[in-house]
C-alpha cells in the first residue's frame, strides 16, 4: 500500500543488503541503511563480518563522541613539536587487515556526523587510511519514526542511502525456527502478519494496533522482530513463571493488543501432542482440528525434526491439511541445516515429486 510515508523510497531486503556489503562496491563506497526500529539492522554487521571473515568494529553513535574517533598525539617534525590525530586502538588499524566498520545509529548524534562523514567518504580515520578492503556502513532509523534520525543532505550525496524492507513472514519463520523461537509465537506471526508490518504501510494507526506508529503516542510497547524475540525468550520460561506473570510481561514487551492474541495461541499450544508422542505414534496420536493448532504443531515439528526421526514426523504431518503440509515442507527446504539431509529422504522426495507446485509458489 502506498502511503505518504513510503512513496519513492528505494528499499532492499536484508539479504540483498548483505550481498551489497559483501561486494567489491562496499570496499570503494560507503552505505547507510535506513530501516524501521527493531528489524535487525545491527545484526547485519555481524552477518557481513562472518561472511567476509573480517573483524567487526561496532561504533555506537548514541554513546560516542568525536573524540572516540581519534586522539591527539604530540610529535616532532623538522624540529617542530606539533599535534596529529591518531585512530583509537579499537579500529584495529595496527593489525593492517580489513575490517567491517559499522556506525550504528549514524544519524542520531548530530555533533558526530561531520567527523563520521570524512570516514565514510575518504575512508580514513585522522590521517591514517583504512585497509583498502575495509567495508564501511552505517545504520539509522526512519526519519518518520520521530526518533531524531535525520541524515543531512551533505551526507546523502557522499554515500549510498538505501532503505531496508521489513522482514517477510517467510523470513521470520525461517529465522525463528533456526534460532529456537517458541512455536506458538511463530504460528502467531504466520496467522497475523501485521505483527511484523511497518507503520509506513498503514493508512491509519488504528488499522494495525500491534506495531509502533509515531501517530499514536500511547504505544509505549509494540510488536517488532526485536520485541518478538524478547517475548520468545520469556515464553520459554512460562512453565516456571506462570501465565499471570508471563501475560503481564508480554504486554510490557509487545503491547497489550499483540500480547492478547499471541497468548491465546500459546494457550492453544498446550492442548497439542508432544513431540515425543508424535514420534512414538505418528498414526495414532490425536491430530489438532483447528487451523491455528495445526500450524503450531507443524512449526514445532519443523524446529525439532532431525534425520533420525524424520520418517514418523512426516507421517504425522501428512495427516494434516495440504496447506499445512506445504508450510512444513517449504520451510524445511529453506532451512540450510535440514535441507542437506531431507533431500535424501525417500518419502520426502516422493512427496515433492507429486506436489511440485507447492515448491514453486
Please tell me what each predicted stretch does.
Residues 2-361:
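C-terminal regulatory/interaction module of P-loop NTP-utilizing enzymes
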Amino acid at each position: 500500500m502506498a502511503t505518504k510515508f513510503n512513496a519513492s523510497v528505494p528499499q532492499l531486503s536484508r539479504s540483498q543488503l548483505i550481498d551489497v556489503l559483501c561486494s567489491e562496491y562496499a570496499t570503494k563506497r560507503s552505505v547507510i541503511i535506513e530501516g524501521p526500529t527493531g528489524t535487525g539492522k545491527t545484526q547485519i554487521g555481524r552477518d557481513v563480518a562472518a561472511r567476509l571473515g573480517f573483524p567487526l568494529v561496532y561504533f555506537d553513535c548514541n554513546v560516542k563522541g568525536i573524540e572516540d574517533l581519534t586522539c591527539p598525539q604530540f610529535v616532532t617534525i623538522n624540529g617542530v613539536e606539533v599535534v596529529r590525530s591518531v585512530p583509537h586502538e579499537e579500529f584495529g588499524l595496527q593489525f593492517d587487515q580489513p575490517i567491517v566498520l559499522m556506525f550504528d545509529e549514524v544519524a542520531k548524534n548530530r555533533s558526530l556526523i561531520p567527523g563520521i562523514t570524512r570516514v565514510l567518504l575518504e575512508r580514513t580515520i585522522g590521517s591514517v587510511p583504512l585497509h583498502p578492503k575495509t567495508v564501511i556502513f552505517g545504520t539509522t532509523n526512519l526519519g518518520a519514526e520521530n526518533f531524531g534520525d535525520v541524515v543531512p543532505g551533505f551526507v546523502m550525496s557522499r554515500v549510498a542511502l538505501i532503505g531496508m524492507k521489513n522482514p517477510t513472514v517467510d523470513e521470520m519463520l525461517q529465522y525463528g525456527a533456526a534460532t529456537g523461537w517458541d512455536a506458538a509465537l511463530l504460528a502467531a506471526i504466520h496467522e497475523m502478519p501485521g505483527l511484523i508490518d511497518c507503520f509506513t504501510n498503514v493508512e491509519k494507526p488504528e488499522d494495525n494496533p500491534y506495531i509502533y506508529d509515531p501517530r499514536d503516542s500511547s504505544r509505549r510497547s509494540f510488536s517488532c522482530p526485536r520485541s518478538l524475540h524478547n517475548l520468545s525468550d520469556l515464553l520459554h520460561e512460562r512453565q516456571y513463571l506462570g501465565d499471570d506473570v508471563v501475560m503481564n510481561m508480554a504486554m510490557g514487551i509487545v503491547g497489550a493488543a499483540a500480547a492478547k492474541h499471541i497468548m491465546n495461541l500459546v494457550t492453544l499450544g498446550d492442548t497439542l501432542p508432544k513431540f515425543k508422542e508424535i514420534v512414538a505414534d505418528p498414526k495414532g496420536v490425536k491430530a489438532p482440528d483447528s487451523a491455528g493448532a495445526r500450524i503450531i504443531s507443524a512449526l514445532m515439528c519443523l524446529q525439532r525434526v532431525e534425520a533420525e526421526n524424520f520418517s514418523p514426523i512426516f507421517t504425522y504431518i501428512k495427516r494434516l491439511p495440504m496447506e499445512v503440509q506445504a508450510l512444513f515442507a517449504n520451510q524445511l527446504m529453506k532451512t540450510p541445516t535440514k535441507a542437506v539431509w531431507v533431500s535424501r529422504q525417500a518419502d520426502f522426495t516422493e512427496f515433492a515429486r507429486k506436489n511440485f507446485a507447492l515448491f514453486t509458489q
